């Protein structure tokens, strides 16, 4: 695939960094770009991580400002004063309406301008967080919509879609970057460097790592 280019939607978290490294190994560093979105997220430390990782990996990064989302929607991920809650049923209060739809739209606009057809997103529905825009059916629908809207043959790839978090850690290990992902990425919703170990994102990350390391020990 060395003659093809890819654009990775990149937050600086575990999943998107895993996807970025996989893309570099698949397409070649010179054929990969990253796009990052500032949308008023309370865990803005991830933006700093994203910048550092992109630079460290030698990948061109573009950061787009979508903070206008604060004007039209409210959720715990964009409100520092709101408590982060996990819904027993329904959508968690950290869900940002339309976020992944906007990310894919702006990524596609940018990609077309760069002559890029492959867009990679680290969304996953296996360890389902309750986010409707992380489902495969949504991504496939958005792929069709973008192709029709821009008359362009985009291919949206979601390599983690059916992986558990433990399997995502296993993938990082297979690529030789498990320690890099552990030490350099940021996932915490509360914006705490190293993780708060209490928010849903931290719990999922740590549980998945523990499961993978335990299974590795048993082999």
Swiss-Prot record:
Residue positions binding Zn(2+): 188, 196, 199, 202
Cofactor requirements of the protein: Zn(2+)
Molecular function (Gene Ontology), one example: zinc ion binding
Pathway(s) the chain acts in: Purine metabolism; 7-cyano-7-deazaguanine biosynthesis
Database matches in Gene3D superfamilies: HUPs (3.40.50.620)
Superkingdom as given in the UniProt entry: Bacteria
Cofactor note: Binds 1 zinc ion per subunit.
E.C. no: 6.3.4.20
Xref: InterPro entries: QueC (IPR018317), Rossmann-like_a/b/a_fold (IPR014729)
Pfam families: QueC (PF06508)
Catalyses which reaction(s): 7-carboxy-7-deazaguanine + NH4(+) + ATP = 7-cyano-7-deazaguanine + ADP + phosphate + H2O + H(+)
Residues noted as binding ATP in the record, renumbered to the chain: 10-20
CDD domains from the UniProt entry: QueC-like
Keyword tags: ATP-binding, Ligase, Metal-binding, Nucleotide-binding, Queuosine biosynthesis, Zinc
Family: Belongs to the QueC family.
Function text: Catalyzes the ATP-dependent conversion of 7-carboxy-7-deazaguanine (CDG) to 7-cyano-7-deazaguanine (preQ(0)).
NCBIfam families: 7-cyano-7-deazaguanine synthase QueC
Matches recorded under PANTHER family: 7-CYANO-7-DEAZAGUANINE SYNTHASE
UniProt-recorded name of the protein: 7-cyano-7-deazaguanine synthase
